[in-house]
A protein has these predicted regions:
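Extracytoplasmic small-molecule ligand-binding "clamshell" domains
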Residues: 24-122, 128, 195-200, 263
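Extended ligand-binding regions for polar small-molecule ligands
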Residues: 24-42, 69-81, 147-173, 221, ...
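Catalytic and substrate-binding regions of cell-wall glycan-acting enzymes that process beta-1,4-linked
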Residues: 251-252, 393-459
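Export/targeting segments at the very N-terminus of extracytoplasmic proteins
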Residues: 285-332, 366-369, 383-387, 468
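Substrate-binding/active-site groove segments that recognize
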Residues: 336-360, 366-378, 424-425, 449
Length: 469
């Protein structure tokens, strides 16, 4: 086993526009600190269209040169449209600036981009001070998504008292609030909303629903159907409409009338290519999928090793649930598991890695966990001790380095900064470099461990109550 980690915090720096259009890898990525609102004339003068994109992999992901984000094909087509009558030296290049969905319009208003492409519905009440495009997708309903084998629903009223997991800034939030007002009039229990951790995007929540970690979520119909093709245990309850269908749109600066008119002309004639999801389906169908780490048998396994995880977690100042999450990903909490390259045991540590931290016997659970905890702490101390990293991102970088090697992760952080991404943030930022250079393997590894940690952390009180008995 050779495992390592990556992580990053939030800081977008200026990336110089230059560089020719890379048709194979899709629109380039960039960031800008410009505060001046720009219209089409300024865009043509600079030869760069700065597009603020939703940082989720569903919206703007690219894996080893293959676009899997739904906005990639549209933005590439927009670039061709803008350059249709231009001479070679006057061509405009689209540059992507990935941001959290809830930050897109604010960044647009500050002049940090020329166009915002969220790829999802925005709350209409939050849309002000910007120009709004014609529909990118019209009449988009929000649908309930659950797991096959669990109860299905046909009416909104049946959701009374149920919990729905939503990502930050989900378009379903206001709709559920309106439904709850109607339920209150009927003296029915409200729908409860669990706002998930910001390290999770819509695709992550859907994966956790498929695993049974979350039971229900609500997403846009195109997103639900897209991911159901690669997550076959998802169940889409198409009869349950959450709110009224709305339009997915793009947004420009308030005064960018020429750019808005050009975007609207482009959208009026745009047709998505029939094979636009070919790479997405090929890549994601073979990815590791998380399981429910808190099913009955898994809880029993966790209880059996909980004491040793807590002991060595405390010794190395690592949350024991981080160790538990890593152990579940590596061995499904099976101390007898055998891997490749000599990796073995609960943590799938290799003898060479154990020897580096002074542990010679990893055949038993105690030594196996001790070696892994020490190794994680060594990586953290030598490479990721900066106070600029928050603890969640620090742990993500440690895991990435555990999987890839610390030096490689540090090089990825440097490349992220060079491109205007946030080198102190792993999730959705530095992970983009890993996806480009290595593929989904290390990104999937870190994300899976993170999901298991979040699943355990939701049940921390009950898991630690068991520990005190």
């Amino acid at each position: 086993m050779q495992r390592f980690l990556l992580i990053v915090s939030l800081m977008f720096s200026l990336l110089m526009a230059a560089a020719a259009h890379a048709a194979v890898s899709g629109p380039a990525q960039a960031s800008s600190t410009s505060k001046l609102p720009r219209d089409l004339a300024q865009v043509r003068s600079s030869k760069v269209l700065r597009v603020l994109v939703n940082q989720s992999r569903n919206s703007s992901g690219e894996i080893k040169g293959e676009p899997v984000g739904i906005e990639y094909h549209r933005l590439r087509a927009l670039e061709h449209f803008l350059n249709g009558r231009e001479r070679q030296g006057d061509l405009i290049q689209v540059k992507l600036i990935p941001r959290a969905k809830e930050q897109l319009l604010g960044a647009l208003q500050r002049g940090e981009g020329d166009l915002a492409a969220p790829g999802e519905l925005l709350d209409p009440a939050q849309v002000s001070g910007v120009g709004v495009s014609a529909p990118v997708l019209d009449n988009v309903p929000l649908l309930l998504v659950g797991r096959k084998g669990e109860r299905s629903f046909s009416r909104v009223e049946q959701l009374s008292g149920r919990t729905i997991a939503l990502t930050t800034a989900s378009g379903a939030g206001p709709a559920i609030q309106a439904i709850n007002q109607q339920l209150a009039l009927r003296k029915r229990a409200p729908i409860k909303v669990e706002w998930v951790d910001p390290t999770l995007a819509v695709e992550d929540v859907l994966e956790m629903v498929q695993a049974g970690i979350y039971h229900l979520t609500v997403v846009e119909r195109p997103i639900a159907l897209r991911w159901a093709r690669v997550m076959p245990r998802l169940r889409v309850d198409s009869k349950v409409l959450i709110g009224q269908p709305q339009a997915v749109r793009w947004y420009v600066g308030r005064e960018a009338d020429q750019l808005l008119a050009t975007v609207d002309r482009f959208l009026a004639g745009y047709r998505a290519p029939e094979n636009q999801d070919a790479a997405f389906e090929r890549i994601y169908r073979r990815q590791y999928r998380v399981h429910n780490p808190l099913a009955r048998q898994e809880r029993q396994r966790l209880q059996a090793v909980r004491g040793v995880l807590q002991k060595h977690g405390e010794a190395q100042q690592i949350d024991w649930l981080n160790l538990a999450a890593l152990a579940f990903k590596e061995s499904t909490l099976n101390p007898a598991a055998r891997g490749v390259g000599g990796a073995h045991g609960l943590m799938q540590i290799t003898p060479s890695a154990a020897q580096r931290v002074g542990v010679s016997n990893t055949a038993n659970v105690d030594g196996n966990v001790q070696a892994s905890a020490r190794y994680l702490a060594l990586i953290r101390r030598k490479f990721f001790a900066s106070p600029q990293l928050n603890e969640r991102e620090r742990m993500a970088f440690v895991l990435a380095a555990y999987n890839l090697g610390p030096e490689r992760v540090q090089a990825m952080r440097a490349e992220a900064r060079r491109r205007g991404l946030n080198g102190n943030q792993w999730f959705f930022q530095t992970e983009r470099i890993a996806m480009e250079q290595v593929g989904m393997g290390p990104v999937n590894f870190v994300n899976s461990v993170n999901k298991y940690f979040l699943a355990f952390n939701r049940e921390r009180a009950s898991l630690e109550r068991v520990a005190r008995r």
